[in-house]
Regions:
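N-terminal signal-anchor/signal peptide hydrophobic helix marking the start
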Residues: 6-12, 16
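Residue-level signal for discrete positions within transmembrane alpha-helices
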Residues: 12, 116, 120, 156-159, ...
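An internal, D/E-rich "acidic patch" concept
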Residues: 69, 74-136
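Membrane-water interface segments at the C-terminal ends of transmembrane alpha-helices
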Residues: 23-29, 157-189, 218-224
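Hydrophobic alpha-helical transmembrane segments of multi-pass integral membrane proteins
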Residues: 17-21, 87, 125-129, 172-173, ...
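Alpha-helical transmembrane segments of integral membrane proteins
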Residues: 2-3, 117-118, 126-127, 131-150, ...
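Juxtamembrane/transmembrane-helix interface segments of polytopic membrane transporters
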Residues: 19, 23-27, 32, 170, ...
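Hydrophobic alpha-helical transmembrane segments of membrane transport/permease proteins
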Residues: 16-82, 181-204
Length: 348
């Protein structure tokens, strides 16, 4: 097992390198950039005009600007160096987790990520936890009562819930429960109250949970369907295997067969997928929710950095996200071994 872990850790290096290389050259070749946007701001031009000028690959937006100012802008953003040199310099710094400074925020990228991280971790972790706590029992319930009226009804409910956009559900919750036209049970925005620091330890926990309730519900809404059906189908698949038939023939009770034998095999894939499910919620499901509830997290940061061509933030976030994804994949494999020691990855 140790040899397998070492092999997977070594494979992280070329995988991470390939992903960063592809994204570096794709983003560098995309139209627009920080220099063009800065010149547009200086000239008070509209963003549409700037984009049109960039498509022509000219610096007409710099008309009226002195050439030395243009050179200073290039030097400021590091574009005075060849693209190959910029790429190698980026890799060298990233090995030391030095992502540079944001072009527009005047703060180190690593500090910026640390600042936004608690919001996204909160949303991702609690949403994933809620989905698992509901979907696993519900999936087992549906497997036991396959094709019965309650199974069909619950399938309709979770499929309809899955079809509702998270941002639309967020607006509905705000209207009804966050000071819209009905009740003011939950706060409208933010992760904590203004007087958070003055609260007791228990008060801080209650305030924190009070603020994340609605965002977590919105993000979780679309995650129930796939996991619930996965749990159900996993149990149904195991129930049809020969070892279950043999156990029944030997007189084992249905409950003993289900929980002593079927459960461990069926739940293996579901539990092992928790790290990657968390990262999926963490990275991709919170952007619109962060916007609606005014939560300044990594989803909003990534979107704004891409739009503004803030390359240090884009590449720094991508590097961290990719690294976490690769580590989560390894953790998933290790969870498989913990749940079922018969699995041997060293033969792979």
């Amino acid at each position: 097992m140790i040899a397998y872990i070492l092999k997977r850790l070594l494979l992280i290096i070329p995988t991470l390198l390939a992903i960063m290389t592809i994204n570096f050259f794709l983003i560098q070749s995309a139209p627009g950039g920080p220099i063009e946007q800065m010149m547009a701001k200086i000239n008070n031009t509209q963003s549409k005009e700037t984009q049109g000028l960039v498509k022509e690959r000219s610096y007409r937006a710099s008309q009226g600007l002195e050439s030395d100012l243009l050179e200073n802008l290039k030097k400021l953003y590091g574009f005075d160096k060849p693209i190959g040199e910029r790429y190698l310099l980026m890799l060298k710094k990233y090995l030391q987790f030095d992502f540079g400074e944001s072009f527009y925020r005047q703060i180190k990228v690593i500090d910026l990520i640390k600042e936004k991280l608690p919001v996204s971790i909160s949303l991702g972790f609690f949403s994933t936890l809620l989905i698992y706590l509901i979907s696993i029992p519900l999936g087992i319930f549906k497997a036991k009562r396959n094709n019965e009226p309650l199974d069909v009804l619950s399938s309709v409910v979770i499929i309809v819930a899955n079809a509702i956009p998270a941002f639309l559900f967020a607006v509905v919750l705000i209207v009804f429960f966050a000071g819209g036209n009905y009740w003011h049970w939950f706060p409208l925005k933010g992760l904590v109250s203004d007087n958070f620091e003055s609260l007791s330890a228990l008060g801080k926990i209650k305030d924190y949970l009070w603020h994340i309730t609605l965002p977590v519900l919105c993000i979780s809404l679309g995650g129930f369907a796939s996991l619930t059906l996965l749990v159900k189908n996993s149990f149904l698949d195991e129930m049809g295997k020969l070892y279950v038939v043999s156990a029944r023939a030997k007189g084992c009770s249905v409950g003993r067969i289900f929980y002593a034998h079927v459960f461990r095999n069926a739940i293996l894939l579901v539990v092992a997928g928790f790290p990657q499910a968390f990262l999926g919620m963490f990275f991709s499901s919170s952007l619109l929710i962060e916007i609606v509830f005014s939560l300044d997290g990594l989803g909003l940061l990534g979107y704004e950095s891409i739009v503004s061509r803030d390359y240090p933030v884009v590449f720094g976030s991508l590097y961290i996200f990719t690294l976490l994804g690769l580590v989560a994949s390894l953790i998933s494999d290790l969870l498989c071994v913990v749940i079922d020691p018969r699995i041997d990855f060293e033969k792979r």
